[in-house]
Amino acid sequence: MLTSVKLEVVDLVEDLSVLISWVRFNRPKLEAGANFGVSVQHDVLSNLTSGRNSAISVYQSIANYYFSRGRVIRKMQKNVGIEDYRRSVLSLDVKQFVEASQIVADLRSIYLMLADKLFKNWKYVEAPKGSKQERQSRSDFYM
């Protein structure tokens, strides 16, 4: 299960990195007035970055689990007769399974939140300055 979760986390980080780069390259320079679309684009960019950072921390927590498990197993091999080390490994595995289930739910939430933000504000992300008519009606920005 952790292998597939790790692959999903890696996919999310890669997808968000591409989106972050795309938004950054499409961001015009700030000028006086008519920067509403740019501010929307900046808000979306900060959400993308936050989602990417969350995914990276999830990946690091999975790596920490493997390190902790290996450390306990090494102690278990040195002290073969102590049952508490076996229980510790089992407890660590159960804890990680619960965390992995939560990670999957968190990944889903990150994808949904970012998709919602992007779909609702796509015209501002794609063309933040827009045409003169679009600049006059900026009341349809969704948070």
How should each PLM-predicted stretch be described?
Residues 1-143:
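Long, contiguous alpha-helical bundle segments
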